[in-house]
Amino acid sequence: MNLTGITEYDEVNEKHFVDSLSIVKAIDIENIKTVIDIGTGAGFPGLPLKIVYPQLHVVLLDSLNKRVKFLNTVIEELGLKEIDTLHGRAEDYARQTEYREKFDLCVSRAVANLSTLSEYCIPYIRVGGIFISYKSGNIQI
């Protein structure tokens, strides 16, 4: 299906799963209840966060329907609850009151440059919430 350019097992493990979970070094994940993953692609980082922290309510948003269909299959196969997918553009859903300022945490990885990504993501974060952009291999607080 070609959802990611990384195909080697060790590389997938490190660059997708470990990288997705690295934010727990920077935030208190136990205080997070709701997460939206903008431009989720194959489900990273939102899917690993949901698997390891099942108490989270996660929304995975992507503009490509083939990715959303894939994610729906994964969610069903894994029997995950409290996880939703959205097919569409981040800037469009951000205008909807159902999603605007509703999330404790907004994450995004490899979507756009930081200024554009901030415009996409910040509308989703509630007051006091957190926006994390996965932009390098190092965690900076």
Question: Locations of the language-model features?
Answer:
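Short, glycine/charge-rich beta-strand/loop segments that flank catalytic centers
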Residues: 39-42, 65
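S-adenosylmethionine
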Residues: 57-59, 63-141
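Class I SAM-dependent transferase core
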Residues: 1-36, 66-69, 73-86
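Flexible, active-site-adjacent loop/turn segments at secondary-structure boundaries
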Residues: 4, 10, 15, 42, ...
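Conserved beta-strand elements of the Class I
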Residues: 36-38, 105
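Conserved SAM-binding loop of SAM-dependent methyltransferases across substrates and taxa
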Residues: 42-55
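Active-site phosphate/pyrophosphate- and oxyanion-stabilizing loops and adjacent acidic/basic residues
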Residues: 21, 47, 119
